[in-house]
Amino acid sequence: MDHCGALFLCLCLLTLQNATTETWEELLSYMENMQVSRGRSSVFSSRQLHQLEQMLLNTSFPGYNLTLQTPTIQSLAFKLSCDFSGLSLTSATLKRVPQAGGQHARGQHAMQFPAELTRDACKTRPRELRLICIYFSNTHFFKDENNSSLLNNYVLGAQLSHGHVNNLRDPVNISFWHNQSLEGYTLTCVFWKEGARKQPWGGWSPEGCRTEQPSHSQVLCRCNHLTYFAVLMQLSPALVPAELLAPLTYISLVGCSISIVASLITVLLHFHFRKQSDSLTRIHMNLHASVLLLNIAFLLSPAFAMSPVPGSACTALAAALHYALLSCLTWMAIEGFNLYLLLGRVYNIYIRRYVFKLGVLGWGAPALLVLLSLSVKSSVYGPCTIPVFDSWENGTGFQNMSICWVRSPVVHSVLVMGYGGLTSLFNLVVLAWALWTLRRLRERADAPSVRACHDTVTVLGLTVLLGTTWALAFFSFGVFLLPQLFLFTILNSLYGFFLFLWFCSQRCRSEAEAKAQIEAFSSSQTTQ
């Protein structure tokens, strides 16, 4: 009888082992079928995914964990107890299946679960729990209405048996690595929210997740719940075609060099004729000085961003470049304000120590803004990568070029684009008002056609003086991108040269008027 009982027990164990093996085979077969049927509807995809989750939660396996893997799906299951102290998983330690084209080399990922994970579940059911993780290396099961681009096309999911996990005080950390720098991209940690945005399957949502970027190639997601996670990638700036990089660089180099020489000549001529200068000329010279500083800092910026140069030197040059740009924009606005005083307030425009006060504003305010940015966080300045794509590869490949510039998206949005936008808007309004005022004055003249050429020169000069060409920076999108790149590069790299031409024309005009007054005075004296 004892022998019969032992034999019966052995048969039961063998049967249980065979059933467990069949379950693993069924799971693996099901995962392979999911890859074959991935082109079906989103509703069918959700059913497949939920079925895989239930199979992982209910399957039996010996030991602590179970790992199953196909070329694009990896499933893991872990047995947890209420004394759970945390769990860390990395793609480097997991068994990986070689993929065609070396797709596994795109990047790595990791998940870190806190000890708090099992707290609520153990309060209601203090028994063994099951944690499952499902990793996808494609996005076929998570298509939203925007066809969003995901970092490495990775989707990492996790679920705990016996209820949902939400509002964790110690978040789940999900890390993604890429084999190239991610600068130039807006990266957002998101999770798959079923039924979101009126979609039958769901959509990506950033709720409950915080995005951090510890390095140029890593994204860290801190989320207070469990679900399927990914990182959305969006291009911050419009990508520059690689074949246009060389001509744009050459134009910038030549244009800025010409502007530097022209600005130096203008400043030297000003010091030579300093006794004859007035407040208007001194304001022009401050604008020339800011443009000179801007061009010099801009030409040095790419060289200082290279690796042999210390990072502190690049940070200092980036701050100097930002300061020069803010000073240049401020002096453009001062030119607009001064033009308003000249045309609008014909009488009583004397302001005590006028040029000195403008100098404090033009040079002091930008310095204060830059120092404030540095005091808040010194890393706002440094090497900044500009993404450049290769159109011969259909935009799939990109390379990077670096300059010393503003690295913080907030500082760039507020103190570069916002500051420049307000300055350009103010000067465009002043320019329109000045042209309307000049037209009204010309209508009162006896022979307006005689002044047509002079008015054209005046309009072009005012356009240059007020820096309205810098407004082209806000047209770098869509069909305007390529024309904007060349127009902005040509016009603004030669900005110092155009100011030099304006200075020369104004100088010749003032000398001609002075000569005419002397001749008129001499003729009147002769007549008497």
UniProtKB/Swiss-Prot annotation:
Where in the body, by tissue, does this protein show up? Expressed in immune cells. Primarily found in granulocytes. Found in eosinophils.
Intrachain disulfide bonds: 189-221, 209-223, 314-404
Q: What highest taxon heads this organism's lineage?
A: Eukaryota
Primary location recorded for the protein, binned into one broad class: membrane
Which family does the record assign? Belongs to the G-protein coupled receptor 2 family. Adhesion G-protein coupled receptor (ADGR) subfamily.
GAIN-B domain ranges (all copies)? 78-239
What's the name of its gene?
ADGRG5
Q: Which InterPro entries match?
A: GAIN_B, GAIN_dom_sf, GPCR_2-like_7TM, GPCR_2_secretin-like, GPR1/GPR3/GPR5, GPS
Question: Which residue stretches belong to region GPS?
Answer: 189-239
Task: Describe, as the record does, how this protein assembles with itself and its partners.
Answer: Heterodimer of 2 chains generated by proteolytic processing; the large extracellular N-terminal fragment and the membrane-bound C-terminal fragment predominantly remain associated and non-covalently linked.
Q: What is this protein called?
A: Adhesion G-protein coupled receptor G5
Q: Which UniProt keyword terms apply here? A: Cell membrane, Disulfide bond, G-protein coupled receptor, Glycoprotein, Membrane, Receptor, Signal, Transducer, Transmembrane, Transmembrane helix
Task: Work out whether the entry's keyword set contains Disulfide bond.
Answer: yes
Protein's membrane topology: Multi-pass membrane protein
| Function statement | Orphan adhesion G-protein coupled receptor (aGPCR). Ligand binding causes a conformation change that triggers signaling via guanine nucleotide-binding proteins (G proteins) and modulates the activity of downstream effectors, such as adenylate cyclase. ADGRG5 is specifically coupled to G(s) G proteins and mediates activation of adenylate cyclase activity.
Q: How is it modified after translation?
A: Autoproteolytically processed at the GPS region of the GAIN-B domain; this cleavage modulates receptor activity.
A Gene Ontology biological process term: cell surface receptor signaling pathway
Glycan attachment positions: 58, 65, 146-147, 173, 179, 394, 400
Region called Stachel, residue ranges: 228-236
Q: Which Pfam families match?
A: 7tm_2, GPS
Q: Where is the signal peptide?
A: 1-21
Q: Which regions of this chain are Cytoplasmic-facing, per the record's topological domains? A: 272-280, 341-353, 436-455, 506-528
